[in-house]
């Protein structure tokens, strides 16, 4: 006789505070894991970009070159370079080890909200309050953008890249997806200014958060609305949202000092993680592990699953 298979264990959620990073760079506008999750970057209102080992709580390097606050950053696939963008209207390509500016790209007419590398880290994609997305060639000496997407009617708040596709959210309420191979653009109107967009890990779904305190999950190919997630507060600020490392949960920052977790399939709010008293502006989920970074009150908090023990004991 065979016994019924045991029910799969519910995935752990990162709700145990492991470290706090005192960033000392004014307000932390964004925190981002690098590609393998071993390091993270923080963007400061004091114009600095910092590289950390968040698991040890140690600062590795500070990058100075922007003329105004740094708003977003991303790491290259081989960890040798960083890109960042700023209210100074520029995008900078950095050498990680040297701490030096490799290239400074100018062309946006207003502050640059978001930045990403393509998968090979040969192109930087940036989105600006000037309503345009610009693509910059990291390898050429060409000062101007190699491609400009200007379909948006208002500022670009968020861009993400997956294979040959660019996903962009705009204050005009549209979620736009550019297929670079086919040269096609699809738009889904969500009705409220979009603050953050993400691809699911399998790239089949799109997540968008809006200033109506709602997150929406859409089927990438059909645009069908698969889920709506509410219970957090997002009416005024550009806040981050994302999916967990195995696509089991939807996460969002909240203006009430928490991070909210929803079950992706059921849509139920399963955890309100109390981070602090102030707005939680940014978050980043580890690419493969149950580990979350949050940015609030001038610092970064590193969260792990309840069963996590550090090497050499808990």
Swiss-Prot record:
Keyword check for 4Fe-4S: no
SUPFAM superfamilies tied to this protein: WD40 repeat-like
Record's GO cellular component terms: catalytic step 2 spliceosome; cytoplasm
PROSITE patterns xrefs: WD_REPEATS_1, WD_REPEATS_2, WD_REPEATS_REGION
Alphabetical keyword list: Cytoplasm, Repeat, WD repeat
Signal peptide: none
Gene Ontology biological process terms from the UniProt entry: mRNA splicing, via spliceosome
CDD domains xrefs: WD40 (cd00200)
Pfam families found in the cross-reference section: WD40 (PF00400)
InterPro entries per the UniProt record, alphabetical: G-protein_beta_WD-40_rep, WD40/YVTN_repeat-like_dom_sf, WD40_repeat_CS, WD40_repeat_dom_sf, WD40_rpt, WD_repeat_MORG1
PANTHER family assigned to the protein according to its UniProt record, in alphabetical order: WD REPEAT DOMAIN-CONTAINING PROTEIN 83, WD40 REPEAT PROTEIN
UniProt family annotation: Belongs to the WD repeat MORG1 family.
Protein name: WD repeat domain-containing protein 83
Gene of this entry: wdr83
